[in-house]
C-alpha cells in the first residue's frame, strides 16, 4: 500500500493548476449562471498569517463547491497595496515603497498558491499600480464633477505619530485606529467626499441586506445615527447674525437658559474680535485643541466653559440668554451649537450648576408642558409638533433630519497613496487634471523623513506643472487619498481588470454584481463596508452601475486565537502557516481551520487538532488506495442486504448533510464531522463478509467528490487514483438518492415515565398502534411495568414510545 506523500501531491497539483490556468474565468461568458465569491483583499505585509488562512480557506470551499454546482465562479485576489507601512519601511530601511510593496506581493502570492486557493490570477489588481490608480483618480474627478468631492477648511483629526489627518471612522476612543496615538485637532483645508449625500439610502438599504449579520447592520445604523427634530434659528443680540441649532426636543425650547458654541465654531472668533473676551477665549480654544474628543465629552469629565460676552434671543419668547463656549460641544456634530436646557439634560444641568446659570422646568414628570406660554398643559409630543409649526410659520425653524454620519475626509499627508488629480492656479483656482493626462504619477525623487508636510512637497518636479485650463504655471495637490478610497471599488475592477479605457464596463459589473458572497473581519463593519456601500450608491447616481448594494451576503469570520488570546507578534504567540504547511501540508492546515469552529466564531489553535486532521486525511488516502481497484470495476448493485442498505443510507445521508451545510449555511465543521463518520463506517463496511462492490464504488466516489472542496490537492489525487480523468472540480456535485434514505427498519426508543428503558428495531412502516403493542410486549419492558397501572401510552411515529405508569 502506498503512503500519502502530501508534499509531492500538493506540489504536483499546484503545478498542474498553474500550467492549465485552471481557475481562469471569462467574465463575458453567459452559458451558466454567475456566482461571485470574494474575500477581502489583504495589505501586502509580506507574510500570510493564520487569519488569512482561515479567511481564504472559507472562500475557497465556497468557490469550489459553487463551481461543482454548475456556476461560472469568479474568485479573484489582489492587493490593498497603498498604505503607511511601506512608507515607514522607506524611512527605516531606505527602500522605496514601490519596491518593498512589490517584493511583499510576490512573497504573499507564492504563499497563497502553496495553500491551494483557486484564485483567478488573471484578474489580479494592486491598488498602488498606475494601471489601477489612474482609475481611482478618474473616479475622484467624476465625484468632483458631480459635487460629491469638495475641499473645505475645518478642524480635523490629526495623528501626531502618523503625522496625517484621519477620518472620523479612523479615530477609536480618541486614539488613532492604526497606531493608538492620542488624536488632536488641527484647522486645515482638506478634501472630502460627500458621504452625507446618501445617508438616508445607506440607512434604509440596510433593511434589504438579509444576508448580512445583524451585528454589522446595527453598527452601521448606529454610526449613521439618524435623529428627527428641528433646526431653530436664534438671533445674536446686537448683531445682524444668527445661529442655527439642531434639537430633537423643540418642546423644551422655553427651558433654554443659555446657548453653547463649540470653541472651534466659525462664529466664535468673529464675535469676540476686539472685545475684552478675545484673549481669554483664544486661550480656551487653544486648550481644547490639545484635548481628545473623549477627554472633552466623557460623562465623568468636568464641564468647562466661558461666557463670550454675547447674548442670543429665544425665537419663542424673545428672552435673551447668554452665549458660552464649552468643552462638551464639538464642532463636527450637528451644527456645532446647542441650546442648553439644564432642567432636562444632565450635562447642561452640571454646567449650569457649576456656573450658576438659570434652570427652568418646562416638562413635568407626567410629560405635560409648563412655563411654555400657550403650550402649557399639552403633552410634550403635542408641544413638539405645535412649536415647530409656529416657528416654521414665522421662518424661525423647520423640521429636520440630522445624521451622526459626517462627510468623509479623504486627504492624507503621506506619499504612498493615490495622488489627488487637481492643480492650483493663481488665475483659475482649483482645476481638475484632464482625463487624458491621467494618471498623475507618484514622483520618485522624494525624501522620506516622516515629518511634517506631505513628502510630495520635496519633489520640485512633481509640484511644478501648468494649469490645464489657462496654461500658466501651477502647482499640484500634494496630499494623497485615504487608502480606503482604493478599497472602496476594487471588487468592481476585478470583473474587468484589463480594461484600459474605463474603471469597469457597466454591462459586466451589472452582470456580476452584487457580489454573491463577501468574506472578511467584523473590524471592517464601519469603514470599509460603509465606504464601499457609499461608492456604489454614488456610482449609481452617476449612471455607472444599476444596482444598489455591493455585497449580497456577508460572512464575518472569527479570529484565530492561541490559548484564548489573539495571535500577535508582540505576544510571541503566533503560528506560521508556512511551518504548518511544511510539516503537515496545506490541506491539513485548511481542514483544521474549517473544522475547529463554526466560521463566525473565534477559533482556538490546537496542535493536537492539526495532528488529528492530518491523521484523518491519511486515513482517507489509505481507504481510497485500498479500494481503488474496486472503484475502477464496472459493477451493479444487484440485490442489497440490510448491511448494504445501511451503508448506502450513511453515504447518501452524509451527502445530503454536506450539501445542505455548504449551500444553506457555512456549516463547514459539521460537514467535515459527517465526512469523518462516513469514513469510519466505510472502514467497518469493507471488513464485512459479502460486501457489495457497487456500494463500495459509490461510497468511495462520494468521499472523493465531497472532500475535494475542503482538501483540494488530496481530492484531485484521489480522483486520478480511482481511474478518473481531468479535474474533480470539473464534474457535477453529486445528488443524493432519496430512495437510499428510506430505511426498511428503524430504531425506536421506549420510555417508562419519561426515562429511556430500551430500544427496539421495527419495520419503518410501522403504525402508532403497532409501535405501542410491540413496546408493551417487549420482555424487558414487561418486567418494568409489571404490578403497576398503565395510565397511558404515547407513541411518536418512528421515534419513541412513552409508557406512563403509577
Curated annotation (Swiss-Prot):
Gene3D superfamilies (alphabetical): 3.10.20.590, HUPs, Isoleucyl-tRNA Synthetase, Domain 1
Main location: cytoplasm
Motif ('HIGH' region): 42-52
Ligand binding (ATP): 569
A GO molecular-function annotation: aminoacyl-tRNA deacylase activity
Catalytic activity as recorded in UniProt: tRNA(Leu) + L-leucine + ATP = L-leucyl-tRNA(Leu) + AMP + diphosphate
Entry EC no(s): 6.1.1.4
UniProt KW Zinc keyword: no
Domain of life (superkingdom): Bacteria
A Pfam short name: tRNA-synt_1
Recorded GO CC terms: cytosol
GO BP of this protein: leucyl-tRNA aminoacylation
Sequence motif: 'KMSKS' region, positions: 566-570
Keywords recorded for this protein, A-Z: Aminoacyl-tRNA synthetase, ATP-binding, Cytoplasm, Ligase, Nucleotide-binding, Protein biosynthesis
Keyword Hydrolase annotated: no
Compartmental location: Cytoplasm
Family as reported in the entry's similarity comment: Belongs to the class-I aminoacyl-tRNA synthetase family.
Database matches in PANTHER family: LEUCINE--TRNA LIGASE, MITOCHONDRIAL (PTHR43740:SF2), LEUCYL-TRNA SYNTHETASE (PTHR43740)
Full protein name: Leucine--tRNA ligase
Species in which this protein is naturally found: Clostridioides difficile (strain 630)
Gene coding for it: leuS
Amino acid at each position: 500500500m502506498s503512503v500519502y506523500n502530501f508534499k509531492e501531491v500538493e506540489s504536483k497539483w499546484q503545478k498542474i493548476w498553474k500550467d492549465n490556468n485552471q481557475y481562469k474565468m471569462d467574465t463575458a461568458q453567459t452559458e451558466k449562471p454567475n456566482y461571485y465569491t470574494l474575500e477581502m483583499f489583504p495589505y501586502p505585509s509580506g507574510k500570510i498569517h493564520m487569519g488569512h488562512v482561515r479567511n481564504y480557506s472559507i472562500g475557497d470551499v465556497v468557490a469550489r463547491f459553487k463551481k461543482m454546482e454548475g456556476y461560472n465562479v469568479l474568485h479573484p485576489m489582489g492587493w490593498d497595496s497603498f498604505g503607511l507601512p511601506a512608507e515607514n519601511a522607506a524611512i527605516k530601511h531606505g527602500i522605496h515603497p514601490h519596491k518593498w510593496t512589490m517584493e511583499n506581493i510576490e512573497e504573499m502570492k507564492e504563499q497563497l498558491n502553496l495553500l491551494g486557493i483557486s484564485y483567478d490570477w488573471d484578474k489580479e489588481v494592486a491598488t498602488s499600480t498606475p494601471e489601477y490608480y489612474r482609475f481611482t483618480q478618474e473616479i475622484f474627478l467624476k465625484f468632483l464633477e458631480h459635487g460629491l468631492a469638495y475641499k473645505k477648511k475645518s478642524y480635523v483629526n490629526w495623528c501626531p505619530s502618523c503625522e496625517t489627518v484621519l477620518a472620523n471612522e479612523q479615530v477609536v476612543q480618541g486614539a488613532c485606529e492604526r497606531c493608538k496615538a492620542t488624536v488632536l485637532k488641527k484647522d486645515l483645508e482638506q478634501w472630502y467626499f460627500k458621504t452625507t449625500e446618501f445617508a438616508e439610502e445607506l440607512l434604509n438599504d440596510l433593511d434589504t441586506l438579509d444576508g448580512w449579520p445583524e451585528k454589522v447592520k446595527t453598527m452601521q445604523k448606529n454610526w449613521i445615527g439618524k435623529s428627527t427634530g428641528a433646526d431653530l434659528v436664534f438671533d445674536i443680540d446686537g448683531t445682524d447674525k444668527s445661529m442655527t441649532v439642531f434639537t430633537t426636543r423643540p418642546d423644551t425650547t422655553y427651558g433654554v437658559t443659555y446657548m453653547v458654541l463649540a470653541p472651534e465654531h466659525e462664529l466664535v472668533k468673529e464675535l469676540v474680535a476686539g472685545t475684552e473676551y478675545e484673549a481669554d477665549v483664544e486661550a480656551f480654544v487653544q486648550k481644547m485643541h490639545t484635548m481628545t474628543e473623549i477627554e472633552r465629552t466623557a460623562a465623568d469629565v468636568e464641564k468647562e466653559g466661558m461666557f463670550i460676552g454675547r447674548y442670543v434671543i429665544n425665537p419663542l419668547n424673545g428672552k435673551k440668554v447668554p452665549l458660552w463656549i464649552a468643552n462638551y460641544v464639538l464642532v463636527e456634530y450637528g451644527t456645532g451649537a446647542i441650546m442648553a436646557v439644564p432642567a432636562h439634560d444632565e450635562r447642561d444641568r452640571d454646567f449650569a450648576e457649576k456656573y450658576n446659570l438659570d434652570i427652568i422646568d418646562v416638562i413635568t414628570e407626567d410629560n405635560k408642558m409648563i412655563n411654555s406660554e400657550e403650550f402649557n398643559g399639552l403633552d410634550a409630543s403635542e408641544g413638539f409638533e405645535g412649536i415647530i409649526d409656529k416657528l416654521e410659520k414665522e421662518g424661525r425653524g423647520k423640521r429636520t433630519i440630522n445624521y451622526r454620519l459626517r462627510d468623509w475626509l479623504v486627504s492624507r499627508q503621506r506619499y504612498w497613496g493615490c495622488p489627488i488629480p487637481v492643480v492650483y492656479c493663481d488665475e483659475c483656482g482649483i482645476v481638475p487634471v484632464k482625463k487624458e493626462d491621467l494618471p498623475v504619477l507618484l514622483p520618485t525623487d522624494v525624501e522620506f523623513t516622516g515629518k511634517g508636510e506631505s513628502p510630495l512637497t520635496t519633489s520640485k518636479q512633481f509640484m511644478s506643472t501648468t494649469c490645464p485650463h489657462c496654461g500658466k504655471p501651477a502647482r499640484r495637490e500634494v496630499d494623497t487619498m485615504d487608502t480606503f478610497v482604493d478599497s472602496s471599488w476594487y471588487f468592481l475592477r476585478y470583473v474587468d481588470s484589463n480594461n484600459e479605457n474605463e474603471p469597469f464596463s457597466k454591462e459586466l459589473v451589472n452582470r456580476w454584481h452584487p457580489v454573491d458572497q463577501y468574506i472578511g473581519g467584523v473590524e471592517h463593519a464601519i469603514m470599509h463596508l460603509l465606504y464601499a456601500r457609499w461608492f456604489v450608491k454614488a456610482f449609481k447616481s452617476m449612471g455607472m452601475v444599476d444596482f444598489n448594494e455591493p455585497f449580497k451576503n456577508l460572512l464575518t469570520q472569527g479570529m484565530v486565537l492561541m490559548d484564548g488570546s489573539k495571535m500577535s507578534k508582540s505576544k510571541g504567540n503566533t503560528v506560521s502557516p508556512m511551518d504548518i504547511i511544511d510539516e503537515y501540508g496545506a490541506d491539513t492546515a485548511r481542514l483544521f481551520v474549517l473544522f475547529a469552529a463554526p466560521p463566525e466564531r473565534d477559533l482556538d489553535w490546537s496542535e493536537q487538532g492539526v495532528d488529528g486532521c492530518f491523521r484523518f486525511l491519511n486515513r482517507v488516502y489509505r481507504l481510497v488506495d485500498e479500494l481503488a481497484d474496486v472503484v475502477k470495476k464496472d459493477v451493479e448493485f444487484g440485490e442489497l442486504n440490510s448491511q448494504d442498505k445501511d451503508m448506502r443510507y450513511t453515504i447518501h445521508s452524509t451527502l445530503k448533510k454536506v450539501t445542505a451545510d455548504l449551500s444553506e449555511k457555512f456549516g463547514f465543521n459539521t460537514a467535515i464531522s459527517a465526512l469523518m463518520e462516513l469514513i469510519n463506517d466505510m472502514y467497518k463496511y469493507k471488513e464485512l463478509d459479502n460486501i457489495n462492490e457497487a456500494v463500495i464504488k459509490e461510497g468511495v466516489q462520494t468521499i472523493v467528490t465531497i472532500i475535494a472542496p475542503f482538501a483540494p490537492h488530496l481530492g484531485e489525487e484521489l480522483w486520478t487514483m480511482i481511474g478518473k480523468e481531468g479535474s474533480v472540480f470539473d464534474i457535477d456535485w453529486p445528488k443524493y438518492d432519496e430512495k437510499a434514505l428510506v430505511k426498511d427498519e428503524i430504531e425506536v426508543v421506549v420510555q417508562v415515565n419519561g426515562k429511556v428503558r430500551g430500544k427496539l428495531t421495527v419495520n419503518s412502516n410501522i403504525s402508532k398502534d403497532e409501535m405501542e403493542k410491540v413496546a408493551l410486549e417487549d420482555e424487558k419492558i414487561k418486567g418494568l411495568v409489571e404490578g403497576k397501572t398503565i395510565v397511558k401510552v404515547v407513541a411518536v411515529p418512528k421515534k419513541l414510545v412513552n409508557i406512563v405508569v403509577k
